[in-house]
Amino acid sequence: MPTWNREALAKRAVESILKQEYTNWELIIVDDCSPNYLNLQGFIEGLADSRIKYIRNDYNSGACAVRNQAIKLAKGEFITGIDDDDEWLPNRLTSFLKDQHKLHQHAFLYADDYICDTSGYLSLESLRIYPKPDYNQQLFNKKNIVGNQVFTLTSRLQTILFDTQLAAAQDYDAFYRLAEQYGGPFKIKMATQILYVNHGEVRITASRKKFSGYFSFYKKHSSKFDKSSKKYQLFTLYYIRKKPMSFRVFRRLLCLRNVKRYMMLHTVFKDKKF
């Protein structure tokens, strides 16, 4: 679990791991040189739980480098991650472990998420589910359909690691390379994580570098994309950059999916789902 300057949220994430039905886990927390860290450090020390390892770096190295640092230290057979502003349901590890045999044929496992757009919730029933499609290579060529976390063999992720040269789309890139090397992933049929999307604190992934990161991802992998996927990716880049699209460019990127996306963004159909 990478963390930076979000003590209260990180505590909630840790508490959700402590509530796991499956108890034979290790948690590696890497603090990327947070200026405010004493409360979190004291909280971890107070738990006196040998399964939890807390490391605070002496300098800020970035989210990808911190993730790689934790991945390299992992000792278990399987590995997954958690962002410091998210929360696991008690059955998350158990659910993945029930399907661990799928990793003989699939690169990794992934699941649906619950979405919370406030600081808290009363019950799971009050949250909406963010549904993810079953794996499809063509769809994965167009966008990240698996989300921000996966469950896989530790040895695989230690081989792949996150690309520290990417300013954004690091998850997409790492999971894409995992699928390339070890086979398409498998989706389990339940939601096991809560993503908090409006907690009001600094968001690590929000920066002006988003366009640069996605453009670098496109250049890195575009030779593997068919024409339709390239059009979809390029439309996404225009959207991220918030650059007006000329009619000439729109014609060049014309495909059914992009027409639907354009309608969602610019017309009375913007509230529709496609």
Report the location of each language-model feature:
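C-terminal subregions of glycosyltransferases and related glycan-biosynthesis enzymes
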Residues: E15, K19, E180, K189-F274
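Conserved donor NDP-sugar-binding/catalytic core segment of glycosyltransferases
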Residues: N91-L124
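The conserved acidic donor/metal-binding loop of glycosyltransferases
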Residues: D83-E87, D112
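Glycine-rich, basic loop-to-helix element that forms the pyrophosphate-binding segment
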Residues: N57-A74
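Conserved short acidic donor-positioning loop in nucleotide-sugar-dependent glycosyltransferases
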Residues: N5, I17, D32-P35, S61, ...
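Short aromatic/hydrophobic "clamp" motif used to bind/position activated sugar donors
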Residues: I79
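Acidic donor-binding segment of Leloir-type glycosyltransferases
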Residues: V14-R56
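Conserved nucleotide-sugar donor-binding catalytic segment
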Residues: Y130-F211
